[in-house]
Amino acid sequence: MKLTREEKRIKRHRRIRKKISGTASRPRLCMYRSLNAFYASLVDDITGNAILTVSSLGKEYVDATGKRGGKSIEAVQKVAEILVQKAKEKGIDKAVFDRSGYLYHGKVKAFAEKCRELGLIN
């Protein structure tokens, strides 16, 4: 039976997760892209806790942009700015990027490049 796009993404994500893991000092920066919003989290895989989570539906994003739920590249870049700012406040200056099985193109690429520009990932 042929795999759906989502099943292929999950398969890629599992393959990536075998090689990538985050610690408390350098957490894993994972993301999720839905049709209506964009979510990003910093995760410590040793304890299994999410250190920090930001989305385009969150209060910080709504306060900064004046609208709820953004799915454009500009919205994704704003989510990256908020995430990096909150990470710096918590004392996190480096993270490992996990593209969650999504192709490195469009919103995923814009998010990663903005985080790189702001110094969170290499």
Curated annotation (Swiss-Prot):
Q: Which InterPro entries match?
A: Ribosomal_uL18_bac-type, Ribosomal_uL18_bac/euk
Q: Entry's CDD domains? A: Ribosomal_L18_L5e
The record's keywords, sorted A to Z, are: Ribonucleoprotein, Ribosomal protein, RNA-binding, rRNA-binding
Question: Would you name any one GO CC term?
Answer: cytosolic large ribosomal subunit
Task: Enumerate the GO terms in the molecular function aspect.
Answer: 5S rRNA binding; structural constituent of ribosome
Which Pfam families does this chain map to?
Answer: Ribosomal_L18p
Question: Which GO BP terms, alphabetically?
Answer: translation
Q: Which SUPFAM superfamilies match?
A: Translational machinery components
Which protein family is named in the record? Belongs to the universal ribosomal protein uL18 family.
Q: How does it assemble?
A: Part of the 50S ribosomal subunit; part of the 5S rRNA/L5/L18/L25 subcomplex. Contacts the 5S and 23S rRNAs.
The protein's matches in PANTHER family, at most eight in alphabetical order, are given as:
39S RIBOSOMAL PROTEIN L18, MITOCHONDRIAL (PTHR12899), LARGE RIBOSOMAL SUBUNIT PROTEIN UL18M (PTHR12899:SF3)
Its function, per the record, reads:
This is one of the proteins that bind and probably mediate the attachment of the 5S RNA into the large ribosomal subunit, where it forms part of the central protuberance.
> What's this protein's name?
Large ribosomal subunit protein uL18
